[in-house]
Amino acid sequence: MTTLDAVVYGADELVAGPATDGRRLETYEDGAVAIVDGTVAAVGPTTEVTAEYPPESANHAVDADGQAVIPGFVDPHTHALFAGDRSDEFAAKLRGKSYQDILAEGGGILRTVRAVRDADEETLLSNLLAHLDTMLAHGTTTVEVKSGYGLDTETELQMLRVIDSADAVHPVDVVPTFMGAHAVPEGWDTDDYTAAVVDEQVPAVESQGIAEFCDVFCEEGVFSVAQSRRVLEAGAAAGLTPKVHAEELAHIGGTQLAADVGAASADHLLHATGEDIDALVDAAVTPVLLPGTAFGLGAAYADATAFRDRGAPVAVATDFNPNCHSHSMGFALSLACVEMGLTPAEALIAGTKHAALALDRTDGLGTLREGAPGDAVVLAAPSHVHIPYQYGTNVVDAILKDGSVVSTPTHESYDREVQP
């Protein structure tokens, strides 16, 4: 027995996903989507979809007249599980302090590490659930969350447990990434800590069986290419797909490493070269660009057009973390357009379909095509262009996750848009 979960109909613009006919997007005017048993069953003109799937027979019927409907956002790079407050560091940066200055004074990542180690599991879960609520309210229906603020076996495992617990109770799908190699903890030599990650943390993470990916901060002054390779190869042997923070602050070869190890994604990439981009394309590694990070630091942005023009499937993420405190994929897409050179259509693809590729999702996630997960966002605007156009504004009006209309503490008006 199948269940007609939802029918969204009458949309001024319904975006099914990237087009295959020369257009950027496959769109429908007066469009509709039907979701059955959590999966998209039909998408197309309202007259055709509703003839087969009558809205009055659905658990949720959404009249989207005057509105646009898009796939739910996929945020493929966050550090959303943390404790403590580093807002004072934002003010310090405005006064001219560099991140390196702040780190030398005991701030930055290591300050968050101390706060996470001091927090109990209940507090960490509460923090993460609150962040997921806000992300959901801004249209994110799938998000990757990394560990990496523990930097010891016990706390890294605790973080992964919390991520798993959040995934079990929250509507947003939460994808877990182990990142013990996020920084070198206080009192450690980098080689010794790399060995601890490889010999102690990775086997413990494998035994726990929660993490899906293994990430490393391959950067000058953090983990070298050789050290990063050790971590990623150990993770791969434990069944964890590699990811790489690469070429953020300097060019040291992290992008080529990502290609060599067959990473799902290489992220940041501010200093990637044309040769690096070609290597990613050849190895089918998705580049993930993080405009919010540059915005928060007042730094240069990656050139998305360089990746696009070489055939790379550019993805965009928030990089939500204590040093980049934005939950909003919409804001990230605005920056990707204004500062990185993407069009609104390209930015939407970067935050949906291509973002799903960065998480190795090939089930249609990030689209509204037949067989894809039933994750859709109804905008309080008639076109997807309003996402980057209304920068700083949350244009999300209603969210469907697996075919169910989801409300959040910050969005309690959905009932006005939904007729059961």
Swiss-Prot record:
Locations listed in the record: Cytoplasm
GO molecular function: imidazolonepropionase activity; iron ion binding; zinc ion binding
Catalytic activity: 4-imidazolone-5-propanoate + H2O = N-formimidoyl-L-glutamate
GO-annotated cellular components: cytoplasm
Amino acids binding Zn(2+): 77, 79, 245, 319
EC category name: hydrolase
Free-text comment on the cofactor: Binds 1 zinc or iron ion per subunit.
E.C. designation(s): 3.5.2.7
InterPro entries: Amidohydro-rel, HutI, Metal-dep_hydrolase_composite, Metal_Hydrolase, MQNX/HUTI_composite_N
UniProt pathway: Amino-acid degradation; L-histidine degradation into L-glutamate; N-formimidoyl-L-glutamate from L-histidine: step 3/3
GO terms under biological process: L-histidine catabolic process to glutamate and formamide; L-histidine catabolic process to glutamate and formate
Residue sites binding N-formimidoyl-L-glutamate per the record: 149, 321
Family per record: Belongs to the metallo-dependent hydrolases superfamily. HutI family.
Role description: Catalyzes the hydrolytic cleavage of the carbon-nitrogen bond in imidazolone-5-propanoate to yield N-formimidoyl-L-glutamate. It is the third step in the universal histidine degradation pathway.
Protein name: Imidazolonepropionase
Organism annotation: Haloarcula marismortui (strain ATCC 43049 / DSM 3752 / JCM 8966 / VKM B-1809)
